[in-house]
Structures are given as structure tokens and as C-alpha cells.
Amino acid sequence: MTITPQHLIALLPLLIVGLTVVVVMLSIAWRRNHFLNATLSVIGLNAALVSLWFVGQAGAMDVTPLMRVDGFAMLYTGLVQVASLATCTFAYPWLEGYNDNQEEFYLLVLIASLGGILLANANHLAALFLGIELISLPLFGLIGYAFRQKRSLEASIKYTILSAAASSFLLFGMALVYAQSGNLSFEALGKSLGDGMLHEPLLLAGFGLMIVGLGFKLSLVPFHLWTPDVYQGAPAPVSTFLATASKIAIFGVVMRLFLYAPVGDSEAVRVVLGIIAFASIIFGNLMALSQTNIKRLLGYSSISHLGYLLVALIALQSGEMSMEAVGVYLAGYLFSSLGAFGVVSLMSSPFRGPDADSLYSYRGLFWHRPVLAAVMTVMMLSLAGIPMTLGFIGKFYVLAVGVQASLWWLVAAVVVGSAIGLYYYLRVAVSLYLHAPQQPGRDAPTNWQYSAGGIVVLISALLVLVLGVWPQPLISLVQLAMPLM
């Protein structure tokens, strides 16, 4: 096939981030300068975000059999870029106090963000696998970036070994699917599945293995065991990326796969996914109840959030509404997580060994950093799904979709899970307003709201509140972002 200028415009975000990777690499080789490399990375990611406008003008198309650029791809590319940008801005003050090599951090974030864009555009199992590897491999390095901290190194090794195992499951599952159907492209798979092939044992085994691999990457129960340890061990800016960008990109591609290849039509697959969703919601919330470490708590809560999203995925066959639900929910989850992890990153910057992640570090934060405490409170309320925040709109959508598809037991799980979640989110929020301990352990810098990370956190809080009261702009955007059928 010939690549036309139209195709190049459609690939702009991918090309810009790829170019930024090369530029940052050369810049590191030329001269180590933390500020320069951070600025280059942020400029590149911003340019990729702006280029989405030109992509939208070019219209939807297939660029190579592996990639399809349409509204859906643009929405998820945008979300991944926002998460990567936030990660870079949170990382800058954190790395200022870090004595080993600082610049490679941005390189790894950029490469992972490249994987995220590839996943958002993937239209083929090969692209899906490449994207997942591109997003996972840099994460091995990022999680262990503070490698002189025992926890960080341990988290990196755990994630690396388990991730390699999960990837092999995923690959073997794809091989079985290919052996049975002879296709790897999502749409061709959809056509061959339409011929009543969904009852073939080989095909079901293939999809089962793929669910194991993808379930690990999305940290769904029972493949979630790495999540709390890795969230706790990884540096705070990395936990931000792990909780947002990698989850959003992978969920986006799974969504597209289920849309084109109606795997959900198989009763067996639906039951398995239903059980996984149910277990993730209940288990994630119950385990978060007893946590005294904020990053572990957010790790367990991310398991339950992915469970809620899975409810919308199972209801995908029942109409357009669940695409909308996932888009709105992910946007709410993105901004709430960016805000929550952003506060942890600001409290932990500059690097001085372990992060400020114990709940005790946040006691009485309100009395000396009132705005930061207010932001953290808003994020906790949004994650809990309290009305007037964006988190509520997303949860409401998921419930509506569940009711529409009459998945009553999952709707019940979402309601019960949200009730349990309320307790531990409010526990974090309340501790911000208690009496401050005599000698506060860690504190955010005095002028935090003027730093790039502080601005990102404040914008996230604003978006969560404004879109929570008036969600129409977001809903319209998500409705525009429909995949090319």
C-alpha cells in the first residue's frame, strides 16, 4: 500500500511522540540537562495533543491494516497524552532531588506513551500485542526508577516477571484464536465469529487465555496480586502513569476488540467476565478498607474501578450507550486519579527516599496547605462517586447501562461496592482535617500552586467539579468519538 499525506496526518500523534523520543535521546547523549529534556518531552507531548485537531480534520481512515484512526482512537489517544503530560510534570520536581540519572525518566514515559497511542489506534491483534509490550517494557524501568529504595526495586521485579508471564498467556491465546479462525484483524475476526464459530473449544480457549493476559494488565481479580505492591513501591509520578495511561489505553483496545469481534455474544465469555467484574468490585473495595498507605489504597480502588468499567463492557451488545458510559467514566477516572496521585507526588517532591504515602503524613494537611487539602477532598469524593463530581456522572452511566442490559447482579455489586468505597475515601478526606501532628513528616513546597504539577492538579480539580455539575461538553465529545464501523 502507498502512504499518502492523508495517512501521515492521521498518524501525526504517533510520529510526533516518536520524533520526541529520538530528540530526547540525542539530547541526553549530547549533554545531560534535566530542565532541557523535561521541556522537550512536554513540548512533544503537547504538540501530539494539539495535532489531534488536524487528525480530526483528515477524517476516519485505516492507516495500514494494523491501525485505524477514527474518533474513538482520537479520544483515547487524547486521554493517554494528558496522562503522560501529567506524569512528566509531576516527575520534574520529584526528580530534582534524585541523585542518579534523571533524564531517562522522560524517555521511558515517552516510549510508554507511544505504546498507548498505538493501542488506541490498534485494529489488529498484532498491533494490540505490540502496543501492550511498548507500554509495559518502559514501565519495568519506571517502577524501579528509585532503585536504591528496596520497595521500588522489588515492585519492578514483581511486575516484570508477572508481566512477562501475562504476555505469554496473551500471545498463546492469540495463537489459538488465529489457528481456529485464520484471522488476526479485529473486523475479519468479527466476520468469522459471525458464522456461529463462537462455540469452538479452541476459540474459547484462545479467548480465555487472552482474558488472563489482559486481566493482568488491567489488574482485575484474580490477576490483581501485583497491584498494591507495585503502586506502593513505584515512585508517585510512575503510579500516576500506571493508574491512568496504561489502564485507559488497554481498556480502549479491549473495547474495540469486543465491538468488532462480538466475543460478548458467547454466554460462556459473558459469565466469566461477569464473575471477574463482580469479584473485582467487591474484593477491591473490601481490601481498600484496611489500608493505611494512600498509594496501596488507590491501588485497590483502581481494581474496583476497572470492575465497574467491565460492567459497561459486558453490556456492550445492548447498544451505543455503553460506549458512552466507558468514555465518560474513563475521563472522570483519569482526572480524579491525576489529582489524587498528583497530591501524593507534590507531597513526595523532591525525592528524599520513600514517598509521603502513609495516611498519617496527610493528617491535618488542611491547617497548613488548605488548597491542597481541598483538592484531595474533591478527588476522593469524585472517586467515591458523590454527586456534583465527574465520578458520579460516570458511575451513574455505568448503573444505567447495567439496568438497560438487565445485569441485575452486577448492578447490585456496583451499588454495594460504591457504598463500601464511600467509607475508605471519606477516611482519607476526614484525616486531612484532623489536628496536625506535632512534627509534620513531609510537606508540599510552599508555592506548590505555581509549579507545573500544582497547576495540573488544580486544573484536574476544576474539571472534576465543573464537568460534574455540567457534563454536557464531555458527553458531546464522547458521542462524537464513535469508532468507524
Curated annotation (Swiss-Prot):
NDH-1 is composed of 13 different subunits. Subunits NuoA, H, J, K, L, M, N constitute the membrane sector of the complex. One of its GO terms (molecular function) is NADH dehydrogenase (ubiquinone) activity. Belongs to the complex I subunit 2 family. It is found in: Cell inner membrane. It is a multi-pass membrane protein. Pfam families: Proton_antipo_M. GO terms for cellular component: plasma membrane. This is NADH-quinone oxidoreductase subunit N. Its main location: membrane. GO terms for biological process: ATP synthesis coupled electron transport.
